[in-house]
Amino acid sequence: MNTYTKFLVKTYLLSFLNVFFIFFCLIYVLNLLTELEFFKQTNVKTFFPLYLSLINTPMFVFEMFPFIFLISTQLFFNTLFTYNEINIFKYSGLKNTKIFSILSVLIFFVGIIIVSFFYNLSSNLKNLYLGLKSNYTDDKKYLAVITNNGLWIKDIYNENILMINASSFNNNELLNTYISEFDKNFEIIRNIKSQRIDITQKEWIIKNAEIYIQNNKEIVSSLKLKTNFDYELIQNLFSNMSSLSFMELIKMRKNYKQLNYSLTEIDLQLFKLITFPFYFILMFIFAAIIMMNTKTFKNKSVKIIIGLFLSVIIYYINNFFYILGTSEKINVISSIIIPLIILTIINSLLIKNINDK
């Protein structure tokens, strides 16, 4: 590795680590305030909100990485400008495009490490966080999971326990469903079997219900069953993809497919992870171009503010297309790729004559 390459890599990584640490601390403090507000009426040990905030912070930091790279790039070039090192490189024959290339390769590999290791660690901590916090919410009385055997739901309503298994899930309906209802002592009350159950509301409508009580069987054309679940709640329970590692997402996708459950959100999460290293590179190039074009600005704060303002615009563009993807207005690939294409076009237009800067 050349001396200038080592210098560029070291300087950029130092800027990156400084910004990462600042973001981590800021997000931790914000999380802590949220947890303190949540537990203000609950008797818990002092360290517990501190601990919850700590294990919840990495996933929020992961979502902020594109902007961490953007600000890191701005600080990196500020350092080069301050000590006139960018001109020294230029006089030595090192073009700006070469600097961009070296750091783009670095960022790509850092991005792979972030997605492969940091994300998996963050998702495991997020899962731990959700599990610990669920003990202090009303949601702890029910549970829903998706396995190879379909959708399983455990619910407690009016002290009765419902164990529900459906082979598939489609259009506000559970299909091929078997329900076992127990009392609080786990004594069986009845079993219910149905091909279709309307779960639009929390009061389910069981169509052509086969009811088994002891050795007796009864068929009812329409049976109402009150639960804590409706279609929207079930969807929301499975919408927190950030608590799943990459391999867990792939496994969950297979289960979703067998259950005929929408793959949109899980595909969005997977494709987002795959494209994240490229997104980091584009954000680096974008920030680098801004810094090169504002090199003559004496006020460093103005450069940072310009970058932050433009990063907010990029965030809302990304969020807009992501919402279009989740609502299935456009397909999954388009919702992730279009913002990257827009950023690529902007970079391509602005990077002209960058070696003359």
Describe each PLM feature range.
Residues 210-220, 328:
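An acidic-aromatic
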Residues 183, 196, 216, 221-223, ...:
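General N-terminal targeting signals
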Residues 210, 221-224, 245-247:
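Mature-chain termini and adjacent capping regions
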Residues 205-213, 236-243:
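Short, surface-exposed secondary-structure junctions/capping segments
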